[in-house]
Amino acid sequence: MKGGKRVQPARPNRINREIRANEVRLTGVEGEQLGIVSLNEALEKAEEAGVDLVEISPNAEPPVCRIMDYGKFLYEKSKATKEQKKKQKVIQVKEIKFRPGTDDGDYQVKLRNLIRFLEDGDKAKITLRFRGREMAHQQIGIEVLNRVRDDLSELAVVESFPSKIEGRQMIMVLAPKKKQ
């Protein structure tokens, strides 16, 4: 769509003349309580200070307004949100594939990778895939999964252990143990 009107996104807080109440509970620039005043008086005080009158909680009776620099307020708010997002860790599920006949050397390499994933705080999905005649020896597959579970018992807790085979594979999910 070319040349369309660009709509200003709605502000989360009403400021200055957008405030509809007749009386407001006013808070000063430093956070001090200034009591309940008329809207015009609050606007005058904000203008004297050279900043905006921002409606903080519109549902209160009367609405709570604060004298502050709205641009700075939005900046601080967005900065705090970014900081929170930075602190959140996205848990990923890493997958390692085994076969019933996985030899000891390969097993150790895969186990090292599983340990690294769990230490990084990620979940690990162990897929045991059967081919051809291996389907007749499902017990070997369960033994492999039990061995993995026992080897990682210090680091991980089993989230789901396969009770039966799904198609041609068994899937076990491990989650890292919480650190004390």
UniProtKB/Swiss-Prot annotation:
GO cellular component: a single term: membrane
Record Pfam families: IF3_C (PF00707), IF3_N (PF05198)
SUPFAM superfamilies per record: Translation initiation factor IF3, C-terminal domain (SSF55200), Translation initiation factor IF3, N-terminal domain (SSF54364)
The protein's assembly and partners: Monomer.
Protein family according to the UniProt entry: Belongs to the IF-3 family.
UniProt keyword list: Cytoplasm, Initiation factor, Protein biosynthesis
InterPro entries associated with the record: T_IF-3_C_sf (IPR036788), T_IF-3_N_sf (IPR036787), Translation_initiation_fac3_CS (IPR019813), Translation_initiation_fac_3 (IPR001288), Translation_initiation_fac_3_C (IPR019815), Translation_initiation_fac_3_N (IPR019814)
Biological role: IF-3 binds to the 30S ribosomal subunit and shifts the equilibrium between 70S ribosomes and their 50S and 30S subunits in favor of the free subunits, thus enhancing the availability of 30S subunits on which protein synthesis initiation begins.
Name listed for the protein in its UniProt record: Translation initiation factor IF-3
Primary location group: cytoplasm
Subcellular location: Cytoplasm
GO biological process per UniProt: ribosome disassembly
GO molecular function, one term: translation initiation factor activity
Phylogenetic lineage: Bacteria, Pseudomonadati, Pseudomonadota, Gammaproteobacteria, Enterobacterales
Recorded superkingdom: Bacteria
